[in-house]
A protein has these predicted regions:
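Gly/Ala-rich beta-loop-alpha elbow adjacent to hydrolase catalytic centers
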Residues: 74-89
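Structural beta-sheet core signal
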Residues: 19, 74, 104, 129-132
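Conserved serine/cysteine hydrolase catalytic core
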Residues: 8-11, 112-137, 175-196
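C-terminal catalytic histidine-bearing segment of alpha/beta-hydrolase fold enzymes
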Residues: 148-196
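The feature captures the conserved acid-bearing segment of alpha/beta-hydrolase catalytic domains
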Residues: 106-165
Length: 196
């Protein structure tokens, strides 16, 4: 029940949006699908070609999260999903604790991220949704399970919004789906324990 209270506690509080685009420099999936802006309040571009670049990128993400004026909704695309998962597992708990949740769009196949973003196989320390536009959900199932994320296969056209309204739409989507996940997990827990 604590999780539900925590979720409803920030329902009317805007989240700071921190975006991590993919390394391929194309429009991020959230922009193509929903018309959300390419960047949130803070954007941490993924320009990583070596472990040195990766560590600099992680320090920039740490700073963006620390400087956010509210809890953070992390929105990542492509290789940015694997990079964000790597960051979440290995960065300071104070920084990661500021993340309310993550929307992870079109993560790459596991083999693509294994070199620079290999990380412990542990659930992410915040709720996360993987949105797989088109393509097969099977392509990302391993990542989804390893991250403890919920998968949303999205292959139908969506209404497109713009500007600040678009980020409010992203927050509502995240909250609605997260509340459904929590309610489902609570119901499942009650069924297992026989509590009604």
């Amino acid at each position: 029940m604590t999780a539900i209270a925590a979720l409803t506690g920030f329902r009317n509080t805007p989240l700071s949006i921190v975006t991590v685009g993919g390394a391929d420099r194309r429009a991020p999936a959230w922009e193509r699908m929903f018309g959300w802006p390419a960047e949130g309040a803070a954007a941490v571009p993924l320009e990583v070609r070596s472990t040195h670049d990766r560590n600099i990128w992680a320090a920039r993400l740490d700073r963006a999260v620390r400087e956010a004026d509210a809890r953070v909704l992390l929105v990542a695309d492509g290789l940015g999903c694997a990079a964000s998962a790597w960051w979440a597992r290995l960065s300071p708990a104070d920084d990661v604790g500021r993340i309310a949740g993550a929307l992870l769009f079109a993560p790459p196949a596991e083999a693509e991220d294994s070199a620079l973003f290999a990380s412990p196989k542990a659930r992410l320390p915040f709720p996360s949704l993987v949105i797989q536009p088109g393509g097969s959900p099977e392509d990302v199932r391993t990542a989804v399970q390893g991250w403890g994320s919920r998968l949303v296969a999205a292959d139908r056209p969506r209404d497109r919004a713009a500007g600040i309204v678009a980020w409010r739409q992203a927050q509502r989507l995240f909250l609605r789906l997260t509340e459904q996940m929590v309610e489902h997990d609570v119901d499942r827990g009650r069924a297992i324990t026989g509590w009604r």
